Amino acid sequence: MVQFIRKHSKEGEIDMKHLIIVKFKENVWARESEASREMLADIRKIFDRTKQIEGVHTVNIYENVTPRPNRHDLMIEMEMAQEALPVYDDSAAHQEWKAKYGEYIQTKTIFDYE
């Protein structure tokens, strides 16, 4: 039997997870390359700033470890209060992420869940 679990923050609001799953265009991302290491460090700096947004609790960035053409490259996982999502959407960090890296993204999946 599958259980539906709702996680509440300390204040009682229902928390959600916001996933950004990204596949970069060809020749943009090579996991072990120096350019990709620098790019990842910059992406981490951008998303670290989102932790300053009230209601954003955690941000984790995961790299794909299976270099196959049908795989995505990064998954950014944010845990936040549902009310924080529109604040994040309007934040300078989110706008910087889109401005700096949007042109390099081949496909992106956004998935929100409780």
Language-model segments: residues:
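Short S/T/G/P-rich N-terminal loop/turn motif that feeds into the first structured element of a domain
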Residues: 2-72, 83-86, 114
